Amino acid sequence: MANIARDIFKAYDIRGIVGKTLTDEAAYLIGKAIATKASEKGITRIALGRDGRLSGPGLMAQIQRGFTDSGIDVLNVGMVATPMLYFAAINECGGSGVMITGSHNPPDYNGFKMMLGGDTLAGEAIQELLAIVEKDGFVAADKQGSVTEKDISGEYHNNIVGHIKLKRPMKIVIDAGNGVGGAFAGKLYKGLGNEVTELFCEVDGNFPNHHPDPSKPKNLQDLIVELKNGNAEIGLAFDGDADRLGVVTKDGNIIYPDRQLMLFAQDVLSRNPKAKVIFDVKSTRLLAPWIKEHGGDPVMEKTGHSFIKSTMKKTGALVAGEMSGHVFFKERWFGFDDGMYAGARLLEILSAFDNPSEVLNKLPQSISTPELNIDLPEGSNGHKVIEELAANAKFEGATEIITIDGLRVEFPDGFGLMRASNTTPILVLRFEADTQEAIERIQNQFKAVIESNPALKWPL
């Protein structure tokens, strides 16, 4: 049996610490396992890309060897943003591709996001890869696969510039956090006619300035300062592999992804009445009524880019988003999450207004908490912990209890959510309400439920 760390096989991707849990040997074996799954589906060619992390080239060589030793042909697109790899996979390889990325994890992490035949690998499909490795159940190749290298950045750029049309040039600031988006985003937005100030767009896998994770306000502070001191109208930020978007107004307000989705939904629905719009369980309760008001059909889904993508395919939804910043456009695009493309669509909408920040600031808003995290005791299963808590929980005054992903409890004046993270051993909590008093009342009800398990510590 091959020696491989089981805990790198996560819910949405494979992710580990390079040289410790994610070794060269592991990358080679995972390459062979993906190739085995591909062969079962009759897939013969896979696109392969990497982000700007220092460990990327080494891991890429190993996974590529795993593919070619298994008879799979490789389209190597080099250093790209994750959405550019998806673009290459869909346009050149029938929807099959592997992206080597650590996303927003610390510099010593890396991992793989995978799609085969147009389907993102997640959940059981990722566990099946582990089973293939552990059983040594690899496909026997009758030939060595070939490798073709191609720069797809020009095609990706031209496709977007070809169909996104701004009403006027805008002045914007972008912050790539030294992630791979920095190599492409500035050129893209200039190509759309904008004046662009670039922050931390030099690709550097050490992330020397701040962490490339726009979902955390501390990572947007440089952008906020630049917007306040300069003459730009709006700020865009990206995570390490540029599949997520952060948005900041001229006056330094962070427009969280559930509010961004209001604007995107309104725009898409103006051309496609009755279209479905998907959002994750963490999103504001003001979103579903907004979608209905603009003629759409709101669909709540569990958190995770792979779940959202599969629900989009099933339902034919035209746009989707989740709180972490993944935005998915099926209308005029390919349905994968793409932070750079979402930024372009946002500029297209906002270019029709003289004061874009005012448009964003006027979007409906409640009082909400940032995400609160509770560490789980070692070895415990977060989903089981939530199930046990939910079994005996009482929520006074609740109007609805939603259990698609953890426990989301709706009240007339707010909601509370607790769910198990799929990527780290924590419980995630979020609260939103019309008033501070209502938030505290809802939090106190959740606190009582959490504290019914003595191993859990209330985070506030």
Residue ranges and their predicted role:
Residues 74-83, 254-257, 279-280, 301-302:
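Active-site nucleophile and cofactor-binding loops and adjacent substrate-binding regions
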Residues 97-103, 107, 227-249, 254, ...:
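Glycine-rich phosphate-binding loop
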Residues 40, 44-109, 158, 188-248:
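N-terminal small/polar loop signature for handling phosphorylated ligands or for N-terminal nucleophile
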Residues 270-430, 435-460:
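Phosphate-binding and adjacent anionic-ligand microenvironments
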Residues 110-230:
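Gly/Ser/Thr-enriched, mixed-charge loops and adjacent short helices
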Residues 1-65, 69-70, 149-171:
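An N-terminal, well-structured beta->alpha segment
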